[in-house]
Amino acid sequence: MNKIHRLLCLLLWIGITAGLCYSQESAGDYVAPSQAGPKGTAPRMQVQLLSSGEPTQQYAVIFYQGDEAFSGLQEFAEKYHVTSAHFTAIGAINGATLGWFDPQRKMYKKIPITGQHEVIGMSGDIALYQGKPVVHTHMVVGYPDGTTRGGHVLEAYVSPTLEVMVTVDPIAMHKRFDPDTDLTLIDPSAK
């Protein structure tokens, strides 16, 4: 009986400790969607128009060492008056913060990415919210051992390059605020 009692106490302690570890996430581990916008700069970004045939335009948006890609894409969208677009990218980064959306908290849990990683894939879209273009992008990064991590891009620092191919569409897409999630979501019926 004494061994069973000790085993039960040990299991209870393990369960409580595991619960405390999970519940000890700090507020700094999360970011609200409204605070998840661009925070850096991309001074070395270069843009080339690849085609301007009807009805779409194709751009190559190239980032270099140290550029913050999310901020650069936002800058591109504003400078070129993008009202609707989608994009894909490959390249490499040296540090990023990705996010996983927690629907109960209505916040992104930060996923820190440190060191050099391959950008296996990045995709996203650009749509208007309150008359301004807003970039929404996700990224999957590869580790040296072949494992991957991914999520919503909060920030990503390029090293040595990130090659983004952007297709700008002729008809504007609009977003609306969704109070159930605190996210701005594309709404095809919005104008």
Q: PLM features: what roles do these ranges have?
A:
Residues 25-60, 64-67, 71-80, 84-88, ...:
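N-terminal intrinsically disordered, cationic/polar leader segments
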